[in-house]
Regions:
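Short amphipathic alpha-helical segment within the helicase RecA-like ATPase core
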Residues: 1-250
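A generic structural signal for tightly packed, nonpolar segments enriched in small/aliphatic residues
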Residues: 48, 187-487
Length: 487
């Protein structure tokens, strides 16, 4: 991991100095070239553009020019991606210094957090199972230089370290293959994180889940040789200003069950079907470090979805935690079954708001692509807060309709409902299914099936699991206010 520090001046011994350069306006004095000269090098100051120059006279540190675009267009989202480009350009150096946190007007706290996140997340790689680690970044030290706003930069740095560490933790879990991360092992990791983060942790085994009436989680697990686990985590700060419940889908590997998935590239990515639970666990682990004042309870619903002689079958009927019965029409619509039990348990505690996060539907991926997640909700106040968090974190959300006329698509002749609504409006019918288990609780469903992984390195994202939703949930909990019970 890269270490960050704050200084009022550039350290004497540093391998590279990252100099922010805007697309117009004055050139920083340390560059030593005018715009015409920079243009001959192909450097125009476009956002995320980089150009390496040799050390200035009498100096040893190389200079890395970093384009930040037009200053009027700068925000934390741009800054995060710009910092990520700087990190990749400087990955061969052991140490760098930069004044990047100070390029925006106003407080340097949020810009610094974005810079730290961009650098840390761009450099992160999951290589636990690789013998050849030669391609890893050599950058171990980053000095954030600020002569006047040292306290703000220090505060933003600490926040950025906490949030980026959480994201890296969630990425590592989601990138780990199912041969190395079962529901039981994930629960053990959750307990360890809880102990290190001041959380209360309770792990429920299969027998306990049966006794609790968690028919969704137990039913999905029926085809697996690995038993299920439900992990309850509780963060209880003094003088809490509200109570939030988070529920994460933790399907450690999703074969589709009897409704077997095709053997294509997407099937191979189904180790990431626990990305929701990974994001929730990582979020919980960051709350104390960030001194969040909201009380947060989390449920991690963990199991495989496998085919076997004992697996869930089409036509089977499950009884869920809240007593509702569900007829199975597709065993690959399993995520909603395990979330339903978690939502039922969460609603019983009467929280001020409840959020579930899941890689739930291909329909949402088809509608929104890989750059944003869908949000469906029964409460506009919760959506508004999530959208504000989305804007601050650049984890994009788009609200899809919870259109109640489509509830009839879930009707069953033999049970209260069935687990799939047909070929159309799949993201909406999945959310309508979940809505049956939240009661009157203000609730939102985050469908992260699209942005769960990245195809390549771009901005703060790296190829592989993205841990999408982690920073968003942290920000939501940190800034939470009680919404109205009305829609």
């Amino acid at each position: 991991r890269t270490a960050f520090s704050v200084s009022k001046s550039v350290p004497a011994k540093v391998a590279a100095i990252v100099i922010p350069v805007a697309a117009s306006g004055p050139i920083p004095s340390g560059v030593g070239l005018n715009r015409a000269q920079l243009s001959t090098l192909g450097f125009e100051g476009r956002a995320s553009q980089t150009q390496t120059l040799p050390p200035a006279a009498g100096k040893t540190a190389v200079r890395v020019l970093l384009g930040i675009g037009e200053v009027r267009n700068l925000d934390t989202s741009v800054l995060r991606n710009v910092a990520a480009s700087a990190a990749r350009a400087c990955a061969r150096y052991e140490s760098i210094a930069t004044t990047l946190p100070g390029v925006m007007r106003g407080s340097a706290k949020a810009p610094t957090q974005a810079v730290v996140e961009g650098i840390a997340l761009a450099l992160h790689r999951w290589v636990a199972l690789k013998n050849d680690k030669s391609g890893l970044s050599k950058l171990t030290s980053v000095t954030l230089v600020s002569a006047e706003k040292t306290a703000e930069v220090q505060a933003g740095m600490l926040m950025g370290i906490a949030t980026s560490t959480a994201v890296c933790t969630a990425r590592d879990f989601a990138n780990t293959p199912p041969s190395h991360l079962t529901a039981r092992q994930f629960a053990e990791h959750a307990v360890a994180i809880a102990e290190a983060s001041g959380l209360e942790a309770t792990v429920y085994n299969k027998d306990q889940l049966i006794a609790m009436g968690c028919g969704g989680l137990v039913g999905v697990n029926a085809g697996s040789t690995e038993p299920p686990r439900m992990v309850k985590l509780e963060y209880k700060p003094a003088s809490a200003r509200g109570k939030v419940v988070l529920v994460g889908k933790g399907v450690m590997y999703d074969s589709g069950g009897i409704s077997l998935k095709p053997s294509d590239g997407m099937h191979a990515m189904m180790k990431m079907d626990m990305s929701g639970a990974a994001a929730v666990l990582a979020t919980m682990g960051a709350l104390r470090a960030l001194k969040v004042k909201t009380q947060v309870t989390a449920y991690l619903m963990c199991t495989d979805n496998m085919p076997s002689g004992s697996a869930l079958k089409l036509g089977d009927v499950l009884t869920m935690r809240n007593g509702k019965t569900v007829e199975i029409h597709n065993t690959d619509a399993e995520g909603r079954l395990i979330l339903a039990d978690g939502l039922s348990l969460g609603a019983e505690s009467k929280p001020d708001a409840m959020i579930d996060i899941a890689t739930l539907t291909g329909a949402c991926l088809g509608a929104l692509g890989k750059k944003m997640a869908g949000v469906l909700s029964n409460n506009s106040g919760v959506v508004s807060q999530l959208m504000n968090s989305s804007s601050r974190t650049n984890e994009l959300l788009w609200e899809l309709p919870l259109f109640h006329d489509y509830r009839r698509l879930l009707d069953s002749n033999v049970a209260d409902m069935r687990n799939i609504g047909g070929p159309y409006a799949g993201a909406t019918t999945a959310a309508l299914f979940l809505h049956e288990f939240v009661g009157t609780t203000p609730w939102a469903h985050l469908d992260i099936a699209g942005p769960m992984d990245a195809d390549g390195d771009e901005g703060w994202l790296n190829r592989g699991a993205t841990a999408y939703g982690t920073r968003l949930l942290i920000d939501f909990c940190a800034n939470f206010t009680k919404p109205s019970k009305k829609k």
